[in-house]
Amino acid sequence: MDGLPDAGKPPIAMKFGISTHLYHDQRLSREHLSAIAEAGFEAVELFATKSHFDYTDPAAINSLAQWLRETGLTLHSIHAPIWDVFGGTTGSSYSTAAADNAKRQAAVRQAEAALAIVRDIPASYMVVHLGTTDANNGENSRAAASRSLEEICQFAEPLGVRIAAEVIPNDLSSAHALVAMLERDFDGSTVGICLDFGHAHLMGDVADAIETAAEHLITTHVHDNRRRADEHLVPYRGTIDWPAALLMMQKIGYDGTYLMELAANGDPSAVLADAQRARQRFERALSE
């Protein structure tokens, strides 16, 4: 980040995007991207699940490139695979922090396969989960997580992509834990933090997580919940203190994209309309 804007300079231009997570239960289509663009959003994050978008299929990648050109959207980021089928109830799941090295390597290979999209479609970031939310299943090894992150960064650096470790509800991935790992094991040039507001809310105080991650914060996942489950609600539909959270984002001088990662809840078009209204509230709050 560039820090707080100097007095007399124009305000930071706010950028907003939507994750294709909104359509995660469907095969991604041009119509989905058109709806996002028509709702006034500038960017997308591709949720890389093979049942949603087959990132290993050259024809699918070519189609995505064409859809992005036609809709005027930018591919802001790619979410590294955590399953190969929506919902994770069938097929394979992937953990970059698996203690079993074969499982860990499988997760890294899938992340690299999804990241290879940027050879055809430019993107700035890949968002990576370190481990899983179940701390008792052998998937959350600190050493394995650090090794995986290093390997993915080595693959990403020549492609000009920065890796963002996501704040998720486990011991490896709180804002405090991620900062400790990055400052211990990485030089900061190719890896940072994706501040997931909803996940931070499940674990504690969102404003505190933002302040903790500040020097490493490079992208976001914006959604809400009622602190009972990871609901991926539109902002202001849960119990996050958004005025306090956005004030802290201003305080740390965040100048990146606010990327909404929302659940469809049966009606993606209604969610998009609600997201438009939330964006307007963000813009007003961040302009004060």
Each predicted region: which residue ranges?
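Active-site acidic/histidine proton-transfer and metal-coordination neighborhood
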Residues: 7, 29-30, 85-192
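Acidic/histidine-rich catalytic cores of soluble enzymes
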Residues: 43-44, 50, 78, 147-239
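Short, small-residue-enriched loops and turns at beta-alpha junctions
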Residues: 52-54, 82-84, 133-136, 169-173, ...
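N-terminal pre-domain/capping segments
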Residues: 2-113, 119, 157, 215, ...
